[in-house]
């Protein structure tokens, strides 16, 4: 699978802004990120939890993970399909995000199909 539409964000709010503008129309994106700890030299990447939580807020899901040449990772995100499998962890994350007021209508619709 080829990495296309690689996006780099320094802050979670930038990713959320991208989702607000593109979640309803785009079919996929790849997000530059790191998995555990943020290296001091890693600008233009987000932690995994920020990426997955924002994706869930808009009804998207993370899937394929690839290593980039500079040792960062690229996480593929795409809209959830109607009858896709939801892990209990992601169901709990959605409930937590809803309680924080972060879920969008798109995210709520995707989550409602999982119940």
List the predicted regions and their residue ranges.
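Charge-dense, helix-prone N-terminal extensions
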Residues: 1-115
